[in-house]
């Protein structure tokens, strides 16, 4: 039997994407998000207009889409409630967001020079896509969200994921990190506690999930995943 519970969050399960862009001062930014999908050689990215990443993409016209594997969840969670914006609303502060301009340092990730665009790739991510902005579409009311259509210029893939002698990724070898209702999943199983789920008071945070084994850096923060739009960041 079906019911109509008035679902507030429609994040049924999509891959986490770490979007790298350049800030206005030239420094790199990372925003975790999961409102993304692909069609042929293009990607559609859903982002909040108040996010640093939205401003960077609109200004610079380029970005890199880095796909983390499920075993990279701790890197992602460290920046899940941070934003590169210098000013944060009182509501976001109450949720646990804070300003962080050095996302690479906080996450413990490594910059890798891109070949066709200015923003760096993330060395640790098995799949990296250098992209150029095609057009931005307004979504929703009050100019709150945008769907950025980007062209994938070049895709870099960890060699062990490629089926030998082909141009295809082995689906059994690739285990993407999935964001499902603000929780992290890999291989269909929860893989890590989520700062985002806690900040957004998701009821299922009361469940028992794997305890983080990292050093705890990035306490209380996130810039893309850390934004309501990790199926579409709103503040990163």
Predicted regions and their residues:
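Basic, polyanion-binding surface patches
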Residues: 1-218, 224-236
